[in-house]
Structures are given as C-alpha cells and as structure tokens.
Amino acid sequence: MHASIFAKLEQLSMRLEEVDVMLSNPKVASDVKKFTKLSIERAQLTPVNQQFQAYLSHHRNLEDAKLMLLEDDMDIKAMAKEEMLDVKKKLDHLYLELKKSLLPKDPNDSRNIIIEIRAGTGGNEASIFSSNLFKMYSRYTEKKKWQIEVISSSLGEHGGFKEIIARISGVGVYSKLKFESGAHRVQRVPETESQGRVHTSACTIAIMPEVENIEEVNINMSDVRVDTFRASGAGGQHVNKTNSAVRITHIPTGTVAECQDGRSQHKNKAQALLVLASRIFDLQQQEQHKEQASTRKELIGSGDRSQRIRTYNYPQGRITDHRINLTLYKLSEIMEGNLNAIIEPLIVEQQTSQLTELNDVLS
C-alpha cells in the first residue's frame, strides 16, 4: 500500500474514534443537529475503517505466512505458499476498494433531484417518447423505493408530454441519475406510420440537484418577477378559471420556472421557486465544472444537455450509450425501469477514470 494512502486511512480511523467519543457525550446527544451530522459522518467512516482493519489483518497473515516459508517441513512450506496466494488476492481486492473509498466525492450525490424531460425533434412522436421516458424513470424510482412528484407538465397534442418536470427524492438519487442529462434519441415505427418506416425523434433530459433550501442559492427576491396565469391543458386550452399557475423569472440570469399542476397558486409558487433555485444552483455548478476543465470529461462526457448520450432502437430491441460504447439488447427490460444494467457501467467508468488519475499521482 502506498504510504500516502496508508496515512490517509489512519487519519480516517482516528477520526472515527473521535466521532464515537463525541457521540457518547450527553451534550452532543441533546443537540439534534450536531448529533445527526456526526451520525452521518460515522455511517460514512465505518465501512472504510472496516475494510482498512481487514486489510491490516490480512497483511499480518501474509507476514506470518512468509515466516512459515523459513520452516524445513515441505508440507508447511506448501501450505504457506497457498496461504500467501490467497491472502494476496484478498489484499489486492481490499486495496482497490480502499482506493475507491478515497476518490473525490461529489458533494451533490446525496441530494434529491429535479428531472426535466422535454420533447425535441420529431413532433408528436417525441412527445410520446417523453412520456415513455418518464414512465421508465418512475418505475426505476419505485424499484429503488424513492418518491416521485410531478411539479409541472405540458401535454402533447396527440399524447405524451411536450415537457414534464418532476422531483425525485430518496437515498442517493443524484448519485444514480446524474449521468442521465443529455439528448435521448429513439428509433421506431410510430403507431400512425402506415408505411412501416422507422422514424427518429429525440428528447432532452436535464438532471439537477435539488437545493435543500432557497438560502443556498442566495436569491434576492427583488430580482424576481412573479407572473400568474390560468393553467392550460393539451393544445393550449385553458382548464382553470382562476390564475393559479405561476411563472417566476430571475431577472439577472434570465432563468424561468413555472408550475401549474398544483391546486393552489400558493403551492405552485412554492414549487416554481424550488425549480428556479435548483436551476440557478445547477448553472453555478456547471460554471465550476467548466473552470475545472477535466472534471466534466471525467464524468462521462461534457455534461452538455445537447450532447446525444443514448439511442433507443425499438426494431432491434437495442439500447446504446454512446459515451462508453455500451450496447445492450435489453430495451424492453430497461424501459420497464430496470436501469441498473446501464447506470452501473457509467458509475464504474467514472471510478475507473478517477482511479487512473489517482494511480498517475501515486506513481
């Protein structure tokens, strides 16, 4: 193990001891905010420390096996060689896992998200596909035991959505779905196509970390314009006689958010403000990533919402993620919400890239 990694793991082990001492303090236990913060830190440190202690234990076993090689008995030597091979495999695996645990953490990974799905090129077929994608993410959310709540939607003229915005909440939502931002292309025969020709259309998805409170973004309410209007349905017809729909504009950035799905103007305003704050926060994050030039490339592509990231080919039952050249013939399964087959390889690709950078630094 590299000396700098060993030193870092020792620091984390010592920090865990400090946290345990603080958590046993009655004064800390009575401070809910501090107790919760320390409990979360302990939950993060514990698995890393367990792996580190296991590594140290196996390393001691390896040293014992080396001593056994000095014995005259050939059977003992054979046992020692076998033991060393087994222990080295375990050490290599643990070392890789420990290096992963020390990789830079995305501070937004624990956040909930705002997901926006917009129909792009392809007219009615794009609107229908946006509905298919929303159902796919809804089913994935259900499998993960997360919660999904529609904030705003605009119906297509012949089904589906021109746009749908939703909030997904739960444990580690952003960490799993952050790579879904980009252009999603579909190739299939529309139901209205009499000649059986395959059409290509697309939807754009934006995944934004949700702000926990508006103060995070520091929005000056004097810079915000609030407009109210009547909610509308498919084709633009008004479905509400009161001005319950709300559009909020952040004048300095030109960022706009609106909500009309809630029953009251008050709820729609609160939801629109949440989306507005999350959009501004996301813009700030993107600017930071541009300054850290290599970061976005490392995160499976540029993060550009216009970048085509995935193709869904229905005639072939094929789905391709262009960022990592991954092709799976499991389209129907994935559209049913079984997204792990495509999400996990993206996470592995990111970790592999980060490990390569770490190894370059250590070498």
From Swiss-Prot:
<keyword id="KW-0648">Protein biosynthesis</keyword>
<dbReference type="InterPro" id="IPR000352">
    <property type="entry name" value="Pep_chain_release_fac_I"/>
</dbReference>
<keyword id="KW-0963">Cytoplasm</keyword>
<dbReference type="InterPro" id="IPR005139">
    <property type="entry name" value="PCRF"/>
</dbReference>
<protein>
    <recommendedName>
        <fullName>Peptide chain release factor 1</fullName>
    </recommendedName>
</protein>
<dbReference type="GO" id="GO:0005737">
    <property type="term" value="C:cytoplasm"/>
</dbReference>
<dbReference type="GO" id="GO:0016149">
    <property type="term" value="F:translation release factor activity, codon specific"/>
</dbReference>
<keyword id="KW-0488">Methylation</keyword>
<dbReference type="Pfam" id="PF03462">
    <property type="entry name" value="PCRF"/>
</dbReference>
<dbReference type="InterPro" id="IPR045853">
    <property type="entry name" value="Pep_chain_release_fac_I_sf"/>
</dbReference>
<dbReference type="InterPro" id="IPR050057">
    <property type="entry name" value="Prokaryotic/Mito_RF"/>
</dbReference>
<feature type="region of interest" description="Disordered">
    <location>
        <begin position="287"/>
        <end position="306"/>
    </location>
</feature>
<dbReference type="InterPro" id="IPR004373">
    <property type="entry name" value="RF-1"/>
</dbReference>
<feature type="modified residue" description="N5-methylglutamine">
    <location>
        <position position="237"/>
    </location>
</feature>
<comment type="similarity">
    <text>Belongs to the prokaryotic/mitochondrial release factor family.</text>
</comment>
<comment type="function">
    <text>Peptide chain release factor 1 directs the termination of translation in response to the peptide chain termination codons UAG and UAA.</text>
</comment>
<feature type="compositionally biased region" description="Basic and acidic residues">
    <location>
        <begin position="287"/>
        <end position="299"/>
    </location>
</feature>
<dbReference type="Pfam" id="PF00472">
    <property type="entry name" value="RF-1"/>
</dbReference>
